[in-house]
Every structure is written in structure tokens, then in C-alpha cells.
Amino acid sequence: MLQPKRMKFRKMFKGRNRGLANGTEVSFGDFGLKAVGRGRLTARQIEAARRAMTRHIKRQGQIWIRVFPDKPITSKPLEVRMGKGKGNVEYWVCQIQPGKVLYEMDGVSEELAREAFALAAAKLPLKTTFVTKTVM
């Protein structure tokens, strides 16, 4: 599971997921999976999508993960009264804005990449689209 090695502070404010995304271009591979909607991905979802893609392309080619879960999400235990401080860190998320490239792939055919990204997209809670590298 992806998570930061060290953080200056253990817990974080909830915050808002507004604004535009950085990393909107396919920069490492030839094909990419781009987020159309806004939301957040957990470390488990990122890993599940990666496994689905890796299995489908049968370990040929290369996959880049362009997102990293760096925000801790806390929750209090069941049947605990309110107050008494913030809950414990339960999992890590990455906030996604529209246009962010989530995964990239290289070394496979476009047809195989489309199929692999379709399997990955089924594991994610966001609406996504297939993109290719623009050559200038």
C-alpha cells in the first residue's frame, strides 16, 4: 500500500477539493488514464487498479503511477461519544481534480492498453478517459 514514509504532522484538516489539476499531460509513457471527474482515490484503489493493469498486460511494457496518497483520513471507533480528540488515521487518500493523469503505460499496443485501462477504470470511483501522448 502506498503511504508517506514520514510526515511533519500525523493528522490533517479535511480541506476542500477545488481548483485545477497539475500533471494533465502524458509525460512518461505513450498512453494514459485521465480523470474526468473530481474526487479522491484511496491507496487500496490505486493498488487494485495497478494490479488489474499489470495482470492484463502480463508483465510486458511498463506502468507509471502518477498519483500518490499523501492525505491521512481519520475516523473514530464505533460507539464512541463525540469529543475527546480527533480519531486515528485509518487510510490514506489522494485528492484528484479533473484532467489529472492517473496512470501511464508504454511498451504495449494501443488496443491492449485500452483494455488494461478499462479494467483499471472499473476499480476506481472516478469517471476516467483514455488519452495518448501528443507529439509536437
Swiss-Prot record:
GO terms for molecular function: rRNA binding; structural constituent of ribosome; tRNA binding. Gene3D superfamilies: Ribosomal protein L10e/L16 (3.90.1170.10). GO terms for biological process: translation. Keywords: Ribonucleoprotein, Ribosomal protein, RNA-binding, rRNA-binding, tRNA-binding. GO terms for cellular component: cytosolic large ribosomal subunit. Belongs to the universal ribosomal protein uL16 family. PANTHER family: 50S/60S RIBOSOMAL PROTEIN L16, LARGE RIBOSOMAL SUBUNIT PROTEIN UL16M. Part of the 50S ribosomal subunit. NCBIfam families: rplP_bact. HAMAP family: Ribosomal_uL16. Binds 23S rRNA and is also seen to make contacts with the A and possibly P site tRNAs. This is Large ribosomal subunit protein uL16. It comes from Shewanella woodyi (strain ATCC 51908 / MS32).
